[in-house]
Amino acid sequence: MLSSFTVAALDLIFPALCPVCEATLGTGRRDPLCGACWDSITRLGPPWCDVCGAAPVLAAMLRERARSSAPPPPCAACASDPPAHDYARSAAIYEGELRDALHALKFSGRRALASPLGDLATEQCAASLPGGIDALVPVPLARERERERGFNQSTLLARRIGRRLAVPIRPGWLARVRSTQPQSDLSAAERRANVRGAFRASDRVADRHVLLVDDILTTGATLDACARALRAAGARRIGVLTVARVVHAAV
């Protein structure tokens, strides 16, 4: 085991750099992101639609929520086209330094980022999650993509979140049963078609409250396909938790 003197000397010779902006991190800093990048993240919080997690909700919804003790109504998008899941939460907006950090995790193998990003999701969203969650289920990657990358970022995030929430992680409860194109270059309609029927859930989800975990919510097509597979296998309640979400102009 290295002595504290040796560790300090190595920090001086080979200083750790922030994976986003390449600023030198302070000696002994455990967080792999620098303070400036961490502080620049635009965090999300209530008021939000309880179904899709979009924030902010409309003023009319806030007024109705204040007047009534009944469960709040969904946003207009969820009312007209309800998703397959029951509720969704995202910690922050997918932009700037958070986008770069997620890219560094996924595409540059910076696995250490899974811990602070998982903490971000937990700290920002845990208080608004319903109780009684039986398991966290990470969104599975295609087998060849996971083999090529060496890991599934959603599993890394789920492990950290599960540790913080004291909820078990069950990656075997959901499988990707066919390969799909990368979603990034597809339209919303193409994304839905691309992942339709791509997932199958274990019958172990029957009558369970499961929380899907992923890194980013973009159009929701992948998460909706996962939720449909879980619902078909008998899941009683399905939630979604992501580190980031794309905020569309229509939200």
Show where each model-derived region lies.
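Glycine-rich phosphate/pyrophosphate-handling loop used in enzymes and phosphotransfer proteins
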Residues: 1-214, 218-251
